[in-house]
Amino acid sequence: MSLDFTVVIPARLRSTRLPGKPLLPIAGKPMVQHVWEQARRSGASRVVIATDDASIVEACRAFGAEVLLTRADHESGTDRLAEVAAQLGLAPDAIVVNVQGDEPLIPPVIIDQVAANLADHPEAGIATLAEPIHEPETIFNPNAVKVVSDKHGLALTFSRAPLPWARDAFAKDRSQLPVGVPYRRHIGMYAYRVGFLQDFVAWGPCWLEQTESLEQLRALWHGVRIHVADAIEAPAVGVDTPEDLERVRRLLEA
């Protein structure tokens, strides 16, 4: 039996590094349309774009997407998802997958994977994905979020800092990956149950979340388990900078 889940794609017009990001053209389409099309290729029963901007609503309706206008004052993307789930009237046990609106090359198969992982791990309130880190510079890049899990695949913590800190290895050489340390980069895709989203909003931000600017730390702070699996297909580059945009344009326009 196929798994029933809803994909929500948050799309905000304001971006400090790349203004107007969701509507930037790539191969003749706005970026958010590419994300929507990839999500539609997954097993999701419904794909919804959530935005706080009327121009994005208009653009999304033009290419046939279901789109909802949300409040503009949400603390995080997860808070926005909670509003969408309420607008859609989803049941507390329904599964919602958050697919970032700046991932025009997101593999549909990992959207299915993260939804299935949550369904298969009832002890977890959230499921998410990671991939191995192979380049030493990625460990020290604050834009690459690192995750460490326990032996059961449950997250111990996430950080923008090098995590774990290989004290002896880094004291000698930071240009090589420490031997025997499985560094992993977090992939910013989440599956939630709607009931959890309601709790998440009620808690409000915690100091650790605000310090790292990582909303998933709010869940860990409140004792929620996060299941982390290695993605079965590595995602291509997301779009955070003008350089990322040009790279994706070259890939899709080739």
From Swiss-Prot:
An example Gene Ontology CC term for this record: cytosol
Residue ranges of coiled coil: none
Pathway: Nucleotide-sugar biosynthesis; CMP-3-deoxy-D-manno-octulosonate biosynthesis; CMP-3-deoxy-D-manno-octulosonate from 3-deoxy-D-manno-octulosonate and CTP: step 1/1; Bacterial outer membrane biogenesis; lipopolysaccharide biosynthesis
Keyword Endoplasmic reticulum: no
Main location: cytoplasm
Annotated GO MF terms: 3-deoxy-manno-octulosonate cytidylyltransferase activity
EC number(s) reported in the record: 2.7.7.38
Subcellular location: Cytoplasm
Superkingdom of the source species: Bacteria
Catalytic activity field: 3-deoxy-alpha-D-manno-oct-2-ulosonate + CTP = CMP-3-deoxy-beta-D-manno-octulosonate + diphosphate
An individual GO BP term: CMP-keto-3-deoxy-D-manno-octulosonic acid biosynthetic process
Keyword set, alphabetical order: Cytoplasm, Lipopolysaccharide biosynthesis, Nucleotidyltransferase, Transferase
Class of this enzyme: transferase
UniProt xrefs under HAMAP family: KdsB (MF_00057)
Family (UniProt): Belongs to the KdsB family.
Function: Activates KDO (a required 8-carbon sugar) for incorporation into bacterial lipopolysaccharide in Gram-negative bacteria.
Protein name stated in the entry: 3-deoxy-manno-octulosonate cytidylyltransferase
